[in-house]
Regions:
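Short beta-strand/loop motif that positions the catalytic acidic residue
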Residues: 225, 231-233
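Active-site nucleophile elbow and catalytic-triad environment of alpha/beta-hydrolase enzymes
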Residues: 206-221
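Catalytic active-site module of serine/aspartate enzymes centered on a nucleophile-bearing elbow/loop
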Residues: 266-298
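Flexible "cap/lid" loop of the alpha/beta hydrolase fold
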Residues: 140-145, 153-187
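Conserved loop-alpha-helix segment in the C-terminal half of the alpha/beta-hydrolase fold
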Residues: 238-269, 273-274
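Conserved HGGG/HGGXW glycine-rich cap/lid loop of the alpha/beta-hydrolase fold
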Residues: 50-98
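Active-site loop/oxyanion-hole signature of alpha/beta-hydrolase fold enzymes
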Residues: 90-130
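N-terminal export signals
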Residues: 5-23
Length: 298
């Protein structure tokens, strides 16, 4: 029973993980972009051959917010907290929430093409992009594949490669597809399922499981990343601590002392929240302040 409950939790969490292959006057003038009119909530954009649902919250410099797998409301109240200082554009990825599925497989790479197309559709120029878990993988791929569309990047509990996760997490990834019907039925009857009754939950778990079974390794791509980046992890995350350090070093951190004046510190930043896990990080009330401070730095 304990193993069954662990695997249920872990496989649902696996769905949250990135897997694949293949102007506000408080902001610096150089980072201004065109803004969406306030109040344009609950809109569907026809982009990249898909109907992408997004909602707009707050005003200021746009921040594209990308949820974790399965749950389009992964950030909870943090979405609205972030919107107090900027314009948050919360996107529902393919097959999630109010964005319908298509015959296309789920992959962070192709999901990132949707995000970049949405940024272009909204005529934002460059936007800050923040993602959690699956959304972190999509955000990272957006910055890799569409560097012209991304200003700053916030990656919350994302991995460079599948081998960055603990072995039990990898095992959960590999079993998710085979349990799709079981988990789909469970979610359909949950508050999440009731909030989004049009989602085919079994299909979503099946396609997510097919994605999470695939190996991926983005190490070679990350070293060429141009977007200024904030990594956020929990002290008890789903990723091995060695992998977190590896990710940080790939972004230029952890190579030398910053010096008394901080002049040798990297442009990118790392935050590790204590008393947190992969499962609590997106809704952690400490997260918005960390993100806002990073986005506001010159």
């Amino acid at each position: 029973m304990l193993r069954r409950e662990f695997m249920k939790t872990a496989t649902i969490t696996a769905a949250l993980a990135a897997c694949g292959d293949v102007g506000d006057e408080s902001q610096p003038a150089s980072r201004h972009t065109k803004l969406i009119p306030p109040g344009s909530n609950g809109t569907v954009a026809d982009v990249n051959g898909k109907h992408i649902y997004y909602s707009v919250h707050g005003a200021g410099k746009p921040l594209i917010l990308l949820h974790g797998g399965i749950d389009p409301d992964s950030f909870g109240q943090n979405r609205d907290t972030l919107a107090k200082g900027r314009q948050v554009i919360a996107v529902h990825l393919q097959g999630h929430g109010r964005t319908p599925d298509s015959s296309r497989a789920l992959r962070p790479e192709t999901l990132s093409d949707d995000v970049a197309a949405l940024i272009g559709y909204l005529k934002l120029g460059k936007a800050d992009v923040m993602g959690y878990s699956l959304g972190a993988g999509v955000a990272l791929q957006t910055a890799i594949r569409h560097a012209e569309a991304v200003d700053r990047l916030v990656l919350v509990s994302g991995a460079l490669a599948k081998d960055g996760f603990y072995p039990e997490g990898v095992a959960a990834f590999d079993q998710l597809e085979s349990h799709a019907s079981e988990y789909g039925r469970a979610v359909k009857d949950s508050p999440l399922g009731q909030s989004y009754p049009d989602v085919d939950w079994t299909n979503l778990f099946s396609k997510t499981g097919a994605m999470t079974k695939r190996s991926y390794d983005w190490r070679a791509d990350v070293v060429r990343l141009r977007a200024r980046t904030l990594l956020v992890f929990a002290d008890a995350d789903a990723m091995r601590p060695e992998h977190i350090v590896e990710f940080w070093k790939a972004l230029g951190g952890g190579h030398q002392d910053a010096g008394l004046d901080g002049s040798r510190r990297p442009a990118n930043q790392l935050a590790i929240l204590p008393n947190a896990t992969h499962y609590t990080l997106a809704v952690d009330p400490r997260l918005p302040d960390i993100v806002e401070e990073f986005l506001a730095t010159t």
